[in-house]
Structure formats: structure tokens, C-alpha cells
Amino acid sequence: MAAAEDEFLPPPRLPELFDSSKQLLDEVEGATEPTGSRIVQEKVFKGLDLLDKVAKMLSQLDLFSRNEDLEEITSTDLKYLMVPAFQGALTMKQVNPRKRLDHLQQAREHFIKYLTQCHYYRVAEFELPQTKTNSAENHGAITSTAYPSLVAMASQRQAKIERYKQKKVLEHKLSTMKSAVESGQADNERVREYYLLHLQRWIDISLEEIESIDQEIKILGEKDSSREASTSNSCHQKRPPMKPFILTRNMAQAKVFGAGYPSLASMTVSDWYDQHQKHGVLPDQGIAKATPEEFRKATQQQEDQEKEEEDDEQTLQRAREWDDWKDTHPRGYGNRQNMG
């Protein structure tokens, strides 16, 4: 029954689709949950789906034409110029790492489309970023000047500062006008100013996003190239292990001076002893063995010598003791009988 009722419901109108998609974008940008959370990603996908429907309806209605100026666009239709910018902002919120490069390129196309429209209608004075074709043609000129000059860097920095200040002023004006416009109390001139300020704000946002997108695309490209290089190197056939080699100079030196360390033994100890005994060069060879009589005489001679040395020591000891006694007993010590 409910499905049958849904079939007879009128399709959503363009303003309703636009307001719903803008509300989803505001909720995604102001969400406290992580961007990769399921709740935020569902809002991102739903917002992109609604914006696709809005873009198709705008194309069917042919709401904007290159034959008209900005003043010819009605105040209530100015907000639909921001649809490509909304698409780029929500596309940047997708968090699929494998499709990150595709998302960046899609978001850049949306922002470029928005800036091209604003540049054509002269919503604000700004320099239109290069498209992919222009950047490819000027690649040689860019690489020829590897490092930008200090003047160019200073001008870019000053432009960013000016955009930031302008963005803060626009946000302050929009916050003061928002309640009156959304409640329907503002007049047509006030509504037109409100949407023109929104268009200028999204111009600044789009320029900043394109700069960050170009930097991220460059980083991803360098990462992919380094990965391909590492893969190609790993795919190379492994070289066979190198064989040990000997320098001719070292080999000749080893033949003359040896290997530089003691060689292995060429004979056993028994062979060495037999060889030296044969040539009569052992320490105990050439000394005649003593007879028993000679051994007895040598022993007796040694004993007599030791006895003489012992007697000499006793005589020397007695002489020392006598000298000591004379030192302590002078001549005439103790003889006092004939003295008066």
C-alpha cells in the first residue's frame, strides 16, 4: 500500500533537492564524528546523489545561458550556481584510499566548473586556475624553472592572506543576513546580495581546494612512481652469487713469504727426535757418561767442600762473637783487686 502511495507522490522540486543537499553538506562539515565514520559517509553519498539530481534538472531546464549576464539571472536562481562547488566539497569528503586519486580529480573538475561559471559571469575578480590540458601544455615551462622566484612566492602568500581576510569578512556578513533571508523577511535586493556573497565565499574555497588537490595529486603520483620502481627492481632476475677471486699480486706474494700464518706440521715429534739423534745434535749427545769411581770421588769432593764451608762458618761465627765481647768488655774490666 505504501509503495503504491509513493508511486503517486509528486517528484521533489528543484528548491527542495537543493536545500536538502546543502543541509547535508552543512552537517558533514560541522560533524563531530570522524569523516570516515559510517554516519558521515552516508550523508556524503546521499548529498552527492541529491546534487547529481539537481545538476540533471538544471541541465534539463537550461536555467543558465552564456547569452545572458549576471544581472539577468534572478536572485532566487543565483544559489544554483553553487551546485558544482557543493559537489566538489562532498567529493573531497570520501575516504576510500584506493579511489583517492579519482576522487581528487573529480573534485577538481567540479571546482573548475564552478570557477569557470563565476569567471564568465564576473561574480568576482580572480585568476582562473589551469585545467589539465593547460597544465600539460605548460609542463615544460614549469619544469624549466624548478624553483619559483622569491617574488612569485611572496605574491602567492599575499594572495592567500587576502583571500583569508576576505573569507572572514564574507562569513561575518552572511551570518548577519542568514536569518532574515531564510525566514523570507528580506527583500529581493537583500536576497541577491546574500547569494552573491555566498558565490564569492565559494570562489575562495574552490581556489584553496584546487591548490591542495594539486599538491596531493603530485604526492600520490610520486608515491606511485616510487612503488613501480621498487616493483620493477624486485622483478629483475637475481644475479648468481659472485665467485671468490684472488689477486695475482697476493698469490705471488703468498708463494714467496707464505700465507702469513704458521703452516701445518710436516713431521711428528718422534721423527724430529730421530733426525736430531742421527745427526748428533741433541743436548745430551757428545757428553761421556761418568764411571762409578769417578762418581764416588766427585761425591766425596763435594762433601769435603761442604764440610770446609761449614767449618769456615763456625770459625767466622766464633770470631764475630769474640769481637762483640771485646766491644762490651774493655781491657781491665773486672780486675780491681790491686787497686787502692
Curated annotation (Swiss-Prot):
GO MF terms, alphabetically ordered: protein phosphatase 2A binding
Coiled-coil ranges from the UniProt annotation: none
GO cellular component, one term: cytosol
Biased composition (Acidic residues): 303-314
Top-rank taxon, per record: Eukaryota
A Pfam short name: TAP42
GO BP annotations listed: regulation of dephosphorylation; regulation of signal transduction
Region (Disordered): 223-243, 292-340
Composition bias type Basic and acidic residues, residue spans: 318-330
Family that this chain belongs to: Belongs to the IGBP1/TAP42 family.
Protein name: Immunoglobulin-binding protein 1 family member C
Organism: Homo sapiens (Human)
Name of the encoding gene: IGBP1C
